[in-house]
């Protein structure tokens, strides 16, 4: 195991532009669930929120969209995913980001996020961690990057000072004018 030190970070000026500290070196850890291989990852922190970016060694999820590969991950490798983010090498608040080749030609990289419960459609602080890891690994073509996620295409930029801004997928309305009874005779209406 290699000892890692985080880089210095400063407080953000804007809520969408946050500095991300990254480890100087990645850590290699063997997982029996991966066929005895080694899964390579780097740990990063976005304002204290941990992200483990998996760069190599994860079992092949085959072809297809990131959403399709996310389903394969959930059905075939949920125990392995839990092992990656849980104790003793992780903890319950950790999010992992599996870097993949994108299926969508408009995207630079593909990524599937997961936590100790299962896959996530998207993760804001995880996206910032991924962008910083890609920069540190020399895998960014410019200061802008597009990521294919199960939730859709996410765009991000990284500034010279390390601040990262994310343009997330659009939110949508599942149901309009939903009535909920809080107590007998007391109704509230809202959208989901």
Segments (PLM) and residue ranges:
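A glycine-rich beta-to-alpha transition motif near the start of alpha/beta enzyme domains, typified by
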Residues: 15-175
């Amino acid at each position: 195991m290699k000892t890692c030190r985080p880089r210095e970070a400063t407080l953000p000026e804007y809520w969408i532009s946050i500095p991300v500290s990254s480890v100087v070196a990645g850590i290699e850890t063997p997982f029996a669930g991966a066929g005895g291989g080694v899964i390579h990852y780097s740990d990063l922190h976005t304002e204290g929120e941990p992200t483990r970016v998996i760069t190599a060694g994860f079992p092949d999820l085959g072809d297809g969209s990131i959403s399709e590969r996310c389903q394969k991950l959930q059905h075939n490798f949920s125990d392995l995913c839990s092992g990656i983010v849980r104790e003793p090498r992780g903890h319950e608040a950790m999010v992992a980001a599996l870097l993949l080749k994108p299926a969508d030609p408009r995207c630079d990289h593909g990524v599937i996020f997961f936590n100790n419960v299962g896959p996530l459609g998207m993760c804001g602080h995880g996206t910032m961690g991924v962008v910083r890891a890609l920069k540190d690994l020399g895998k960014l073509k410019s200061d802008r990057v597009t990521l294919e996620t199960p939730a859709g295409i996410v765009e991000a930029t990284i500034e010279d000072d390390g601040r990262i801004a994310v343009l997330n997928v659009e939110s949508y309305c599942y149901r309009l004018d939903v009535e909920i009874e809080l107590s007998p005779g007391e109704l509230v209406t809202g959208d989901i």
